[in-house]
A protein has these predicted regions:
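Charged, often glycine-rich, active-site loop that binds/positions anionic groups
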Residues: 122-136
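Acidic helix-start/capping segments at beta-turn-to-alpha-helix junctions
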Residues: 110-126
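Extracytoplasmic/secreted envelope proteins and their assembly/folding machinery
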Residues: 72, 95-102, 124, 128, ...
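Catalytic cores and adjacent binding grooves of peptidoglycan-active enzymes
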Residues: 44, 49, 133-196
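Loop/turn elements at helix/coil->beta-strand transitions in domains of secreted/extracellular proteins
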Residues: 55, 107-112, 166-169
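Active-site acidic/histidine clusters and adjacent loop/turn architecture
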Residues: 63-115
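Mature N-terminal segment immediately following signal peptide/propeptide cleavage
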Residues: 44-62
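N-terminal secretory targeting signals
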Residues: 1-47, 194-196
Length: 196
C-alpha cells in the first residue's frame, strides 16, 4: 500500500531570505502565516453513480490527512448492500484507491459507476449461486472492495491503472464491463465469461 503523507498546511513553513534574516523575536508563528496556495492540501473528492440504486454522490471526503466523518458516513451509506440495506464501515483506503486510480488515469473528479460495493454474507452467497467468479471470502464482505467502471475510460485502461498502483487486488471482467479493486494483497485475475 502506498500511503500519502500529508502535512497539515498550517504546519508548513517556507524559508525565504527575508524570513531567514528576521530575528527570532520578530518571527511570525507558522500557524499564523498563510500557506501558499500550492501548499494547501488538495481535497479528496469522489463522484459516483450506483448502477443498482440509481443514486449519485458528489463529495469531498478528506482534506489533507483528515478524513471528514460526515462525508465518510455518507459514502458508507451510498455503498451499502443494495439487496439488504446493510450499511458497512468502509475501509478508508478504498476511497483513496479510487482517487488514486482517477489521478493515474488523468481524470480526477470523473464520475465512477459503482457496480458493487459492500455485500453481506447473504448477498455474497446469493451471487455465488447465480453468477460466476464470486469469491467465497470476498473482500466486498469486509468493505474492502468495490467493482467499478468509469464512463469514457476503457476497462482495459482502468485495469492497467489499478495494476500500476500496486495497492491491492485487481479483477478484470471484460464481458460484464467492470473492474474489481480492493485493498487486500496485491494480485490480479480475469473472468472472461459473464459474472460478478
Amino acid at each position: 500500500m502506498c500511503l500519502l503523507l500529508a502535512v497539515p498546511f498550517f504546519a508548513i513553513r517556507t524559508a525565504t531570505p527575508a524570513t531567514r534574516a528576521t530575528p527570532a523575536s520578530d518571527a511570525v508563528p507558522a500557524a499564523a502565516t498563510p500557506a501558499p496556495a500550492s501548499l494547501v492540501p488538495s481535497p479528496y473528492h469522489l463522484r459516483m453513480f450506483h448502477t443498482h440504486t440509481g443514486e449519485r454522490i458528489d463529495i469531498i471526503y478528506r482534506r489533507g490527512d483528515t478524513y471528514l466523518p460526515d462525508a465518510v458516513a455518507r459514502l458508507d451509506d451510498f455503498l451499502r448492500d443494495h439487496r439488504t440495506g446493510t450499511v458497512p464501515q468502509y475501509d478508508l483506503r478504498v476511497f483513496d484507491l479510487l482517487t488514486e486510480i482517477e489521478r493515474k488515469l488523468g481524470v480526477p473528479g470523473a464520475e465512477i459507476d459503482v457496480i458493487c460495493g459492500y455485500r453481506t454474507p447473504w448477498s455474497n452467497t446469493f451471487l455465488r449461486e447465480h453468477s460466476a467468479g464470486v469469491a467465497l471470502h470476498s473482500l466486498h464482505m469486509e468493505a474492502e472492495a468495490i467493482d467499478i467502471r468509469i464512463p469514457g475510460v476503457s476497462i482495459t485502461r482502468l485495469r492497467d491503472a489499478a495494476l500500476a498502483l500496486h495497492l491491492g487486488g485487481v479483477g478484470y471482467y471484460p464481458v460484464s464491463q467492470f473492474v474489481h479493486v480492493d485493498v487486500g494483497r496485491v494480485r490480479q485475475w480475469s473472468l472472461q465469461s459473464s459474472g460478478k
